[in-house]
């Protein structure tokens, strides 16, 4: 059983007299920066010239400087950039200013695990990964709560890397909910697997297939949307609060019987076999190589597949039904982006 670290295990005084730099001000970047600032840390923001986030960060009270200067001035540098942007930023702005004794921090292990970034041996390399999107990390913090987080140590040149990771986790609210130590390898591979087979890829494909099945059988798109997408959140919320068994306690006997007798016929051994194949591609680095080649090649297949998804009939039906529920609007894509 993994040890769970809480507030009493972390010490924010680790950051006394130090400067923390957050490179980027997107989903995780804005949340970490604001939470750390309100926890008493000295935080600066590093952004490239012309970034639209400069005005937003300054409005929030931060000193904003060019990325290279932020790295030069900081003791701890959080690379809060997309996986695809990190290598170029590292080569141009981070590496030339990454001197002995500094700490490089990530919220996802992709770049380090797959070696798209290879830091020098005389710096600490750590991971602090809240298990939730940035706007939730921020909201929970402002409400006096927190989002569970993972920490990992890749390089410990100072022999104090774990203290730094725990202090950062406390500063963003993670130790309020509980922090577990892992490795860059485990975080990266399990995160990718979850995204691809269950949380994003698996759930999206399952919802679309269910919607298509009902519509092709002559049922209205509206009914198909409610049954296969809208109600999914209600069930997942129950699972999140009380586990699968707890969710089953809250649904009807008929629903329970359909769950346990039909569910395994849909997600059967063949699905698990393909899940294992997806995991193998992650473990071997095949997925990473394909993704790096895709973004270096201009995102052609990526953009085509996203466009295809946007044109699925469930999107038009969903937009129409959600427009009838005004309380849903603040959860729209634009609403979420405005939070940054």
Where in the sequence are the language-model features?
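Active-site-proximal catalytic alpha-helix in oxidoreductases
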Residues: 159-163, 170-173, 178-217, 222-240
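Interdomain hinge/lid region at the active-site interface
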Residues: 209-212, 216-217, 242-303
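Rossmann-fold NAD(P) dinucleotide-binding segment
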Residues: 68-117
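Rossmann-fold dinucleotide-binding core
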Residues: 105-196
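NAD(P)-binding Rossmann-fold cofactor-contacting core
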Residues: 31, 37-60
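Glycine-rich adenosine-cofactor-binding loop
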Residues: 19-32
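A short, basic/flexible loop-to-alpha-helix module at the beginning of a structural domain
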Residues: 1-17
